[in-house]
Amino acid sequence: MRTLVVFYSQGGETRWTAEQVARRLSAEMLELDPAKAYPQKGFAKFFHGGRDATFGAAPALKPYAFDGAAYDRIVFGTPVWAGSYAPPLRTFIEENRAALSGKRFAAFACQMGSGAERAFARLKKTLNAESLDGTLALISPLKKPDHANAERLDAFCAALERV
């Protein structure tokens, strides 16, 4: 199945995970980059990201190339912000809704604590998808690597290979 990993990463955790997923699935990657970067540190990082996630913002993105006809499945990768997915994914989905029609979807999320299941539910709703082929929630996989995260990543990719 021709797969594209579409992701937004602020601190590198989601980028690292996207690279692992893409390598295991022989998939291409598309990193979304907001036209105006989110703050990287301190209170502003959590305030701006959390506000935009909570209120469904769709920030402008820097130009990217996407040919929906080239892929059967899209795997979305996101940090968890205020129990939701990162707003750049919303922009991508809204800009490409027609090209995403009829595709299969999966998702992974990197989080510092909890909220991934809620983020997956919101992503599924935004996609108007009945289901996701698989989901994966990891807690700080780059900063706090552990055996459990590695096992979950392996299982997620193996399950997607069977679909």
Task: Tell me what each language-model feature is.
Residues F76-G77, A107:
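Redox-cofactor binding/interface segments in oxidoreductases and associated redox assembly factors
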Residues L25, T126-S131:
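Short, structured coil segments at secondary-structure junctions
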Residues L100-R104, A129:
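A short helix->loop->beta-strand "cap" motif at the edges of active sites that frequently abuts
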Residues A109-S114:
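Short beta-alpha junction loops
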Residues S131-V163:
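Glycine-rich phosphate/pyrophosphate-binding loop and the adjoining helix
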Residues R118-N128:
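Short, aromatic/basic amphipathic alpha-helical patches
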Residues M1-F76, G83-A86, R90-E95, A99-S101, ...:
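N-terminal beta1-alpha1-beta2 submodule of the flavodoxin-like/Rossmannoid cofactor-binding fold
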